[in-house]
Amino acid sequence: MVKALSARFLPSPLRAGWAFFCLTLLLSPPALAAECVILLHGLARTEASMNTLAEALEAADYWVVNYHYPSTSQTIEELAQQAIEAGTAQCDPGSDKVHFVTHSKGGILVRQYLHDNTIDKLGRVVMLGPPNQGSEVVDKLAAVPGFELINGPAGLQLGTGQWSVPNNLGPANFEVGVIAGSRSINLILSTLLPDRDDGKVTVENTRLEGMRDHITLPVTHPFMMRNPTVIEQVIYFLRHGTFRKTGPLPR
């Protein structure tokens, strides 16, 4: 049987070296801390909506950037350039990978940016309730007085028509998993949607050509990013590139 080498049996110079090695191990950050995760909230929300998810990712040893951007003040093209570049600049310079976890419109910002740009060390992307094919809610309410005031120019770009931004960005050219919600707490908006939905986006319209994986969970659009199962699936996808379909999720 091989026994562990005890430092007290080492010569004095080696003892000092052993102590330094052990101290280095104790002070070294966990391996996953070298991976950065940028969080992008949805339309008319703030970074506070992603706080629960941010805390869970930090507990999983990721470097987390929970970035706030003025979601109702500019177009998707302008917001994408601003948010992605500012977010990546806040990652640890030593990060081996840069992941994204987005809610709703935040996913469209990532698609818009990667349509025209590349990101060094890009890892995986998880989108929560993204209107990847637009939302019928925008189609039917865009002309209603006050809609643009509340949702801004970017909100008007999220319809389902051929003119909408999501429908002009093409297939995913990056590794992405999509989580859709199938419950609604907004029954009025759900009446405007033709299929299973989360109160803002149909399950079908969250799908994106070229995506790596897709799951539907019984969660609502406004609060899915706080749901424990959603959070577990986010972390699982970041680590494995797929969602967990059967059995309990590892803790």
Protein language model features and the residues they cover:
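Helical cap/lid subdomain of alpha/beta-hydrolase-fold lipid enzymes
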Residues: H115-R251
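Generic preference for hydrophobic/aromatic residues in regular secondary structure cores
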Residues: A7, P11-S12, P93, G155-L158, ...
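Serine-dependent carboxylesterase/thioesterase catalytic core
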Residues: E35-H41, R45-A48, T52, E58-P70, ...
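Bacterial N-terminal signal peptides that target proteins for export
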Residues: V2-W18
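N-terminal signal peptide c-region/cleavage motif recognized by signal peptidases
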Residues: S28-P30
